[in-house]
Amino acid sequence: MKKITVLGAGSWGTALALVLADNHHDVHMWGHRQELIDQIDEKHENHDYLPNVALPASIKATTDMKQALEGTDAIIVAVPTKAIREVLKRANELITSKVPFVHVSKGIEPDTLLRISQMIEQEVPDEKREAVVVLSGPSHAEEVGLRHPTTVTVSSENIEAAQFVQDLFMNNNFRVYTNPDVIGVEIGGALKNIIALAAGITDGLGYGDNAKAALITRGLAEIARLGTQMGGNPLTFAGLTGVGDLIVTCTSVHSRNWRCGNLLGKGYKLEEVLEKMGMVVEGVRTTKGAYQLSKEYKVSMPITEALYHVLFEGKKVDDAVESLMARVKTHEMEDLVNMFENQTK
């Protein structure tokens, strides 16, 4: 049995705490809202973020980060991208031993264009960080909380750390694979939120299955183009953290990004949507970062570019769709073939 600290008491952090508790680990959750923490610790539920799920009574929750981190064997970072640096700065002052950091958020920092593993490496010094491990894949917290079969991938430059995390989480309901391609896993997980926003828009506009199928397929091509240019393995995007995560996020009402896009497609303004949802929609921030990365790496990402114009420049959603359909004709597979050929050289 290991002591595992989960930083973050949202839906995903809570669901993963449940998996770890099912595996008989000593799970300590940290959050900053006393009312929510009391709900988890005393009533064994998280009605705000994971309703209708009974949490194991063994899960402990606290607002005292020092208490949560004391003697821990691993730290699960389960806070939104925009809060990661602040939380890590606090944790860094309290960590007394070298432990692996497992991040489960999906995004890109807009100001620096860094992946989350790079942010952790900046904020936590080597003497306190055994390794950085990414956990990603098609995994709605709502279904994990109900113990429905779920499969994810863990990735790290340190294979032993990846296998350690694999063993922490693996059980009959939660299958875990390893993949050494950290860049590909992170980019796939982050950018699928952009395509999910766009998929929600097409559904909100009532365009039907044809449009969404094309959007998902061409969206995957965009993700793979940028991810490979940044150093990822193109095969990763055909796996759980690529096409797998893309499918689940673009087609499910559980997806915050899909729901956000759906409301945009129905005519709501972005500010109205975010206020109405009352939850973090990572795809909005990620769109800004991915748009900038596409310019930096000189990669064609027409869906991302169109969504950027909708979110941040006020372009109408139906005009954005029209501009995508009116693009200059091109070959479907040429760039993907070149991508694989370059990988094998």
Curated annotation (Swiss-Prot):
<dbReference type="GO" id="GO:0005829">
    <property type="term" value="C:cytosol"/>
</dbReference>
<feature type="binding site">
    <location>
        <position position="192"/>
    </location>
    <ligand>
        <name>sn-glycerol 3-phosphate</name>
    </ligand>
</feature>
<dbReference type="GO" id="GO:0051287">
    <property type="term" value="F:NAD binding"/>
</dbReference>
<feature type="binding site">
    <location>
        <position position="106"/>
    </location>
    <ligand>
        <name>sn-glycerol 3-phosphate</name>
    </ligand>
</feature>
<feature type="binding site">
    <location>
        <position position="106"/>
    </location>
    <ligand>
        <name>NADPH</name>
    </ligand>
</feature>
<dbReference type="GO" id="GO:0005975">
    <property type="term" value="P:carbohydrate metabolic process"/>
</dbReference>
<dbReference type="InterPro" id="IPR008927">
    <property type="entry name" value="6-PGluconate_DH-like_C_sf"/>
</dbReference>
<feature type="binding site">
    <location>
        <position position="245"/>
    </location>
    <ligand>
        <name>sn-glycerol 3-phosphate</name>
    </ligand>
</feature>
<comment type="function">
    <text>Catalyzes the reduction of the glycolytic intermediate dihydroxyacetone phosphate (DHAP) to sn-glycerol 3-phosphate (G3P), the key precursor for phospholipid synthesis.</text>
</comment>
<dbReference type="InterPro" id="IPR006168">
    <property type="entry name" value="G3P_DH_NAD-dep"/>
</dbReference>
<dbReference type="GO" id="GO:0046167">
    <property type="term" value="P:glycerol-3-phosphate biosynthetic process"/>
</dbReference>
<dbReference type="GO" id="GO:0047952">
    <property type="term" value="F:glycerol-3-phosphate dehydrogenase [NAD(P)+] activity"/>
</dbReference>
<keyword id="KW-1208">Phospholipid metabolism</keyword>
<feature type="binding site">
    <location>
        <position position="255"/>
    </location>
    <ligand>
        <name>sn-glycerol 3-phosphate</name>
    </ligand>
</feature>
<keyword id="KW-0963">Cytoplasm</keyword>
<keyword id="KW-0560">Oxidoreductase</keyword>
<keyword id="KW-0521">NADP</keyword>
<dbReference type="InterPro" id="IPR036291">
    <property type="entry name" value="NAD(P)-bd_dom_sf"/>
</dbReference>
<dbReference type="Pfam" id="PF07479">
    <property type="entry name" value="NAD_Gly3P_dh_C"/>
</dbReference>
<feature type="binding site">
    <location>
        <position position="256"/>
    </location>
    <ligand>
        <name>NADPH</name>
    </ligand>
</feature>
<feature type="binding site">
    <location>
        <position position="282"/>
    </location>
    <ligand>
        <name>NADPH</name>
    </ligand>
</feature>
<dbReference type="GO" id="GO:0006650">
    <property type="term" value="P:glycerophospholipid metabolic process"/>
</dbReference>
<feature type="binding site">
    <location>
        <position position="12"/>
    </location>
    <ligand>
        <name>NADPH</name>
    </ligand>
</feature>
<feature type="binding site">
    <location>
        <position position="256"/>
    </location>
    <ligand>
        <name>sn-glycerol 3-phosphate</name>
    </ligand>
</feature>
<feature type="binding site">
    <location>
        <position position="32"/>
    </location>
    <ligand>
        <name>NADPH</name>
    </ligand>
</feature>
<feature type="binding site">
    <location>
        <position position="33"/>
    </location>
    <ligand>
        <name>NADPH</name>
    </ligand>
</feature>
<keyword id="KW-0444">Lipid biosynthesis</keyword>
<dbReference type="Pfam" id="PF01210">
    <property type="entry name" value="NAD_Gly3P_dh_N"/>
</dbReference>
<dbReference type="InterPro" id="IPR006109">
    <property type="entry name" value="G3P_DH_NAD-dep_C"/>
</dbReference>
<keyword id="KW-0443">Lipid metabolism</keyword>
<feature type="binding site">
    <location>
        <position position="141"/>
    </location>
    <ligand>
        <name>NADPH</name>
    </ligand>
</feature>
<keyword id="KW-0547">Nucleotide-binding</keyword>
<feature type="binding site">
    <location>
        <position position="257"/>
    </location>
    <ligand>
        <name>sn-glycerol 3-phosphate</name>
    </ligand>
</feature>
<feature type="binding site">
    <location>
        <position position="137"/>
    </location>
    <ligand>
        <name>sn-glycerol 3-phosphate</name>
    </ligand>
</feature>
<dbReference type="GO" id="GO:0008654">
    <property type="term" value="P:phospholipid biosynthetic process"/>
</dbReference>
<dbReference type="InterPro" id="IPR013328">
    <property type="entry name" value="6PGD_dom2"/>
</dbReference>
<feature type="active site" description="Proton acceptor">
    <location>
        <position position="192"/>
    </location>
</feature>
<keyword id="KW-0594">Phospholipid biosynthesis</keyword>
<comment type="pathway">
    <text>Membrane lipid metabolism; glycerophospholipid metabolism.</text>
</comment>
<keyword id="KW-0520">NAD</keyword>
<comment type="similarity">
    <text>Belongs to the NAD-dependent glycerol-3-phosphate dehydrogenase family.</text>
</comment>
<feature type="binding site">
    <location>
        <position position="280"/>
    </location>
    <ligand>
        <name>NADPH</name>
    </ligand>
</feature>
